[in-house]
């Protein structure tokens, strides 16, 4: 599979891709790890020729995009961190209450609350760079006495979200390779145009476009 996968710049006009298999590969991509399991991403599977043409133009009409039969756009959604953190917290809390020994439930619940209700909001919140500077100062002070997370500027946390999204995209491309389908990841694109085409909210960011 790894030997087979290549970034393909031109796609066949006669051999049609199976959209259902692409959907299956996208389902498999959901198994990719993401930081704190927050899943701060969305995926848009584009199959309509008109929209594909618009996306291809926004990708500077690269041949891999203009000849693609389908396009998948990977989006980051850092703005949804509170909603996603709550979902992960609720799921894990239920697991603790069902399966943990009774004497350990309070301790494990407290750790879960500290992480998803305090630390995650502290790390992922944004306010014109101000909160990042505050986090950096806290990190430096804590770092004198114990190991601590240093990359806490708002730009650092944005990078974390994009890295997690990239893991999902890579898992998708490997799954496609397993189906003997070729893909091509594109980073050359007009992100604002793609956001407008897909009618994305302000907090969304285009992370990667994959032609297939």
Language-model features and meaning:
Residues 1-212:
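Acidic, surface-exposed loops and disordered segments
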């Amino acid at each position: 599979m790894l030997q087979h996968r290549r970034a393909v710049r031109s796609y066949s006009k006669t051999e049609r891709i199976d959209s259902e298999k692409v959907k299956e590969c996208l389902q498999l991509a959901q198994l990719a790890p993401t930081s704190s399991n927050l899943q701060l991403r969305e995926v848009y599977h584009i199959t309509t020729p008109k929209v594909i043409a618009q996306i291809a133009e926004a990708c500077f009409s690269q041949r891999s995009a203009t000849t693609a039969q389908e396009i998948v756009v990977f989006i980051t959604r850092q703005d949804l961190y509170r909603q996603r953190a709550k979902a992960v917290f609720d799921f894990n809390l239920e697991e603790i209450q069902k399966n943990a020994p009774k004497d350990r439930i309070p301790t494990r619940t407290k750790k879960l609350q500290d992480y998803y209700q305090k630390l995650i909001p502290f790390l992922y919140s944004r306010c014109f760079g101000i909160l990042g500077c505050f986090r950096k100062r806290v990190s430096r002070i804590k770092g004198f006495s114990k190991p601590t997370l240093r990359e806490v500027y708002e730009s650092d946390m944005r990078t974390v979200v994009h890295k997690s999204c990239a893991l999902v995209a890579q898992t998708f491309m490997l799954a496609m390779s397993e189906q003997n389908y070729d893909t091509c990841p594109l980073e050359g694109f007009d992100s604002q145009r793609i956001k407008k085409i897909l009618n994305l909210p302000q907090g969304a960011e285009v992370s990667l476009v994959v032609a297939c």
